[in-house]
Amino acid sequence: MINHIKNTLFLTICFLAFQSSNLFAQKGLFSRQKVVNQYATVGIGGGSSHYFGDLAPYSYAYYGLYTNVRWNGSMNYTRFLTPNAAARVSFSYARLAGDDYNFSQKNLEKMAGNYLRNLHFRNDLQEFTLSGLFNILPQYGKGAKGRSAMMPYVAIGVGLYGHNPKARAAADFTGPNGELEKQPWTSLKPLRTSGQGLPGYSTKPYSLVQPVMPIAIGIRLKINQNFDFTAEAGFRLTPFDYLDDVGSGEYPAKSLLASVGGNQSADFSYRAGETYSALKLTNRGAQYKQAAETHAKVQVSPTIAPSNNPESIYPYSSSRGSKRIDSYILTQFTISYVLSNNIKCPPIR
């Protein structure tokens, strides 16, 4: 699967290079006779962020459109090279999140194992992309003044993002008056929760910088001569399985994790035994019996609880995650200012 995505990224780069060569091959694209079609915009916007992966399975992707949704902010510079094609440089800061406890309750019958697993994460991404924008409908007007009142478009590009997945430790009664309290966010990569880089594991520690391929569709509306409004939804392909810090394979042995990263590594790796949701602070016992019976396919004791021998229901031999890569969707609503609003007439020779 990862090789397939790498091939897709390579083909995308080739496609962009081909499209760019076509644009530059047009006679005198930057000649005085052609600049009449060119102008630039700068934009700022924001929207929602949607994660898909081990904690939001693709088989239930529709839940991910409204569950554990977070936010993003963006800035961009766009240069319209022809009436129907543009190049855009964008920077986005996006927060992604996933939570087994919250997501699995959308369909506990089908996601009982996820409920028992009880993992969660938060990841703040700093994404830099270069994209080509192509109008879906033809535009015949020239320059900024000739742009259409409404124009649907598609975008495809390549880029990089920095990231750092984090999670909270188990909720504890550490409040000022002894009340249940959320714990601070902790970076997960150093803890090697899926066995990355541990003796006997082939998986190497992952990088905090990864490639990304944005594929988007949007609509651009002309507010007036100086401003545009853009609504865009973009799917991000990335050959990476650790946006959520959850890899494939069985849980690493508790003793092995503890020998490398101490008890903290083991505690963040296997979380089926936590009584309370680390994010919601609610007791997991209410649905635990149902999830345990569904997952184990046997009747369990009425007094069963997460803290009562959880390994008998969700053993360390369980798969911590799948081999499928992670991805995300960004919706972005942008206000753009037109930098060049005058048609530049070439000199008569």
What residue ranges belong to the model's regions?
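Extracellular loop and loop/strand-boundary signature of outer-membrane beta-barrel proteins
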Residues: 29-30, 58-64, 113-121, 141-142, ...
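Residues that define the transmembrane beta-barrel architecture of outer-membrane proteins
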Residues: 38, 67-71, 124-128, 148-150, ...
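Residues on the lipid-exposed face of transmembrane beta-strands in outer-membrane beta-barrel proteins
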Residues: 44-48, 75-79, 130-136, 156-160, ...
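Surface-exposed strand-loop-strand hairpins of Gram-negative outer-membrane beta-barrel proteins
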Residues: 47-76
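Repeated loop/turn-to-beta-strand initiation elements of outer-membrane beta-barrel proteins
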Residues: 52, 84-87, 139-142, 226-229, ...
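Gram-negative (and chloroplast) outer-membrane scaffold detector with strong preference
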Residues: 83-85, 91-186
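Outer-membrane beta-barrel "beta-signal"
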Residues: 133, 324-349
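Flexible glycine-rich, low-complexity coil/linker segments exposed to the extracellular/periplasmic environment
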Residues: 177-201, 254-325
